[in-house]
């Protein structure tokens, strides 16, 4: 597959009060964000509540997203599995519903050494129906993907890249250096999931972002990315300052409660999360709307 780069949306999954996926709102959201210049769609990650949805729901989400996205746009759903067999079965299902790659987190119960991480992902890459993007999100999985493991995996033809949501620029530079030292940088895309540090990640060598903010302000994320790529760093820093303010507002409540409330305020779906997790309260929603209105988001 072509190298992953640019702004890929970490897509929300609109649901009703009972946690049933709202496919009409999902189609509306995909059409909204893909019409604004993003380069890919990543449903069912942390922002998309993939860990909370049943397999049947997840397959239906991928099907709707793939049918709603423009032809040829990468569709990269999240995989949160506890063993290789479970992961491979899920990946095969996604392949049959239009996915083009998968975003795979490490198993999250036992600690994993670098060798164990490499072994797990290598086994998946050897057998999976789709290319892998490794997902480093230690705040949720409690497993940090070791740079040495990622560098070794980067040479695998079925490993396309890594999304780093660790919010640790030191880790990111160590990772990028390890991949470069392994001679695999040309075919392996490091993408950030931390828009508050987007400029720094891009300057360090990341190729783009898979981000929640693109659900709400895709044009702003794209403007930051484009400014860095054009060498307009003063503009990029100013735009990122605004993006940080938006991000701060959208991090209120449990992930991704504020994002759900924000797109509802924009006319897409409702504010509900997948049960048992709770949405923002009416008071919290009013405060969020006030903050986003002051930032010219609403």
Features from the language model and the residues they span:
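C-terminal alpha-helical cap/extension of soluble enzyme domains
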Residues: 3-12, 32, 36-38, 203-206, ...
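Catalytic alpha/beta core domains of metabolic enzymes, predominantly
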Residues: 126, 138-251
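Generic structural "secondary-structure junction" signal
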Residues: 14-17, 53-55, 111, 139-147, ...
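Alpha-helical structural signal in soluble globular domains
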Residues: 36, 60, 64-68, 93, ...
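Active-site beta->alpha loop and helix N-cap motifs at the rims of alpha/beta catalytic domains
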Residues: 2-144
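Secondary-structure boundary/capping positions in well-ordered alpha/beta enzyme cores
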Residues: 72-73, 131, 160, 182, ...
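A general structural signal for well-ordered alpha-helical segments in protein cores
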Residues: 26, 58, 62, 87, ...
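Hydrophobic side chains within alpha-helical segments
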Residues: 19, 61, 93, 166-167, ...
């Amino acid at each position: 597959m072509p190298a992953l780069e640019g702004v890929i949306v970490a897509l929300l999954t609109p649901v009703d009060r009972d946690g049933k996926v709202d496919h009409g709102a999902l189609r509306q959201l995909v059409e909204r964000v893909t019409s604004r210049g993003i380069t890919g769609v990543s449903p069912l990650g942390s922002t998309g509540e993939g860990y909370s949805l049943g397999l049947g729901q997840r397959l239906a989400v991928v099907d709707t997203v793939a049918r709603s996205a423009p032809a040829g746009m990468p569709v990269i759903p999240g995989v949160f599995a506890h063993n290789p067999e479970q992961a491979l079965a899920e990946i095969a299902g996604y392949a049959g519903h239009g996915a083009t790659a998968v975003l795979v987190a490490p198993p999250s119960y036992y600690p994993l050494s670098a060798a164990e991480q490499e072994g797990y992902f290598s086994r998946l890459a050897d057998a999976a129906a789709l290319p892998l993007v490794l997902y480093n999100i230690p705040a949720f999985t409690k497993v940090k993907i070791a740079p040495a493991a990622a560098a070794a995996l980067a040479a695998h033809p079925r490993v396309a890249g890594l999304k780093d949501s660790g919010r640790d620029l030191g880790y990111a530079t160590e990772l990028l250096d390890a991949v470069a030292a392994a001679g695999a940088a040309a075919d392996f895309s490091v993408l950030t999931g931390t828009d508050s540090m987007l400029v720094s990640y891009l300057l360090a060598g990341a190729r783009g972002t898979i981000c929640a903010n693109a659900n709400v302000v895709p044009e702003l994320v794209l403007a930051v990315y484009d400014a860095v790529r054009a060498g307009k760093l003063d503009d990029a820093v100013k735009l990122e300052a605004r993006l940080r303010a938006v991000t701060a507002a959208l991090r209120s409540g449990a992930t991704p409660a504020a994002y759900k409330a924000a797109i509802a305020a924009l006319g897409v779906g409702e504010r509900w999360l997948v049960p048992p997790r709770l949405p923002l309260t009416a008071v919290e929603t009013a405060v969020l709307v006030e903050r986003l209105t002051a930032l010219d988001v609403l």
